[in-house]
């Protein structure tokens, strides 16, 4: 099975943010990514979050998402889009998935492989991120028991997809508040083959006890930040 992956386009009307993010260029990069995914005959495409970014109005954010959705739809490749902190801060979860309802991720089993999608756009107190929030360093996955149950019931290999970071090698600001507990749970399961992450724009790859942690470089900061993985 071939997966096409990309992360952190931060698509918006802004030409440059934070001195290094070329937000307005990302729509063209997404188009090129899907051309590549079609050439590679990918079975599924996954965006690992921060598809968009804040604008002056919610209407403009929705317009940006509509433009991206059109590219995804025209590709005819099944696509899942995880929500990232910038997506949640720009629109909120309900609005984001209202705009991208056909691309909302769902746990999926294909050819005996289980793909699990984790949403960590929550504060440490369990409250979900809302439009207008901005503390991206306070991030928490509140469904650890659900993950534990899913891993315990899995019969084959498991692949996890999440925007924020669990990998201990990534700096602390980008890691979940409960990353250590999730890391232990993943290692103890013996089922997880890889954890795919975004959020940390530099990207990195680590491996612990046979589990690969693959953090994709940000599309908004790189001309070719889209990848194919065979699982």
Give names to the regions the model predicted.
Residues 5-7, 44-50, 78-85, 159-162, ...:
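Active-site neighborhood of phospho(di)ester-bond hydrolases with catalytic His/Asp-centered motifs
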Residues 13, 54-55, 89-90, 167-170, ...:
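Short, solvent-exposed loop/turn segments at secondary-structure junctions
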Residues 37-41, 75, 150-156, 189:
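Glycine-rich phosphate-binding loop signature in dinucleotide/nucleotide-binding domains
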Residues 122-124, 165-168, 202-203:
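Short, catalytically relevant binding-site loops at active-site mouths
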Residues 18, 61-62, 128-132, 152-196:
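Active-site-proximal segments of metal-dependent phosphoesterases and phosphodiesterases across multiple
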Residues 57, 62-148, 181-191, 205-231:
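Extended active-site neighborhood of metal-dependent phosphoesterases/phosphodiesterases
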Residues 1, 43, 105, 112-113, ...:
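Alpha/beta-hydrolase fold active-site loops
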Residues 1-61, 153:
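N-terminal active-site segment of His-dependent metallophosphoesterases
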């Amino acid at each position: 099975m071939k997966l096409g992956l990309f992360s952190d386009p931060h698509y918006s009307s802004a030409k440059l943010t934070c001195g290094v993010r070329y937000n307005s260029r990302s729509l063209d990069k997404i188009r090129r990514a899907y051309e590549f995914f079609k050439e590679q005959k990918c079975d599924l495409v996954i965006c690992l979050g921060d598809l968009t970014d804040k604008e002056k109005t919610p209407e403009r954010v929705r317009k940006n998402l509509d433009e991206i959705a059109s590219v995804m739809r025209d590709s005819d490749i099944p696509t899942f889009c995880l929500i990232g902190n910038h997506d949640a801060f720009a629109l909120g979860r309900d609005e984001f998935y209202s705009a991208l309802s056909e691309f909302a991720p769902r746990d999926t089993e294909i050819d005996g492989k289980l793909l699990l999608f984790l949403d960590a756009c929550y504060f440490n107190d369990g409250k979900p991120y809302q439009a207008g929030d901005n503390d991206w360093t306070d991030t928490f996955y509140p469904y650890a028991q659900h993950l534990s149950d899913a891993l315990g019931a899995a019969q084959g290999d498991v692949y996890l997809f999440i925007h924020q970071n669990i990998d201990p090698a990534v700096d602390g600001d980008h890691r979940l508040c409960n990353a250590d507990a999730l890391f232990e749970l993943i290692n103890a399961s013996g089922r997880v083959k890889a954890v795919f992450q975004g959020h940390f724009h530099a990207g990195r790859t680590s491996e612990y006890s046979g589990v690969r942690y693959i953090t994709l470089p940000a599309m908004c900061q790189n001309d070719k930040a889209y990848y194919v993985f065979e699982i």
